[in-house]
Amino acid sequence: KVTSSIETIYKMLEELKEQVFEANLQLVKYGLVVLTWGNVSGIDRNKGLFVIKPSGVPYDDMKASDMVVMDLEGNKVEGNLNPSSDTPTHLELYRNFDNVGAVVHTHSPWACSWAQAGRDVNAYGTTHADFANCAIPCARGLSEEEVKGEYELNTGKVIVEEFEQRGIKPEECPAVLIHRHGPFTWGKDPFKAVENALILEEVSKMAYQTEQIASLDNDSNIGIEQYLLDKHYQRKHGKNAYYGQSK
């Protein structure tokens, strides 16, 4: 029975490693990363372990077996390579956002542009409302002390702080920007987290273009009414959601 249990755990981790590997490749497929600028992780909460991309390894050279297994204390459990340098950020999100099953970090250009400007991505239409029920928050930049200290861990702490201060539930807004840095997204699994990174990039682009068009006519009357935002969010994600097919 002990052997069977170990084999089951091993099989589940191998499946998670494959998912995380494939999700990392999706970042390239969807144009969300260049070079090695990005990472995906996924967690098995029952086992208290998560899997993350190795640091600085080109996507073309990666294999599923290269994925690194970590525990929730930040210790490497399995893998020959070093984990992503952003691992402490992922870990802090897993520790604080109980329903998150996977985390993505990219430097996708549209989302990064808003982050570098220190701006929230405001909700201007129903495309955004289908994704989140509020503006995508841009968390504060890190202090010099935070940067010189445990930088990546403190990045995660700033994200958690931002959501707590604004009263935002991570399930209702699966994305955040870090001022002067870039975006993080999350989801129930690695593929959903990547999907959310792709949607964030699209709504970031739309928001910029909306502001540019509105500025031509000095039109400040842009934005989505709360009742319309609520309708679109709830019909897709709410208790009585009816978007899509019955499961």
Question: What function would you assign to each model-found segment?
Answer:
Residues 5-247:
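Glycine-rich flexible loops
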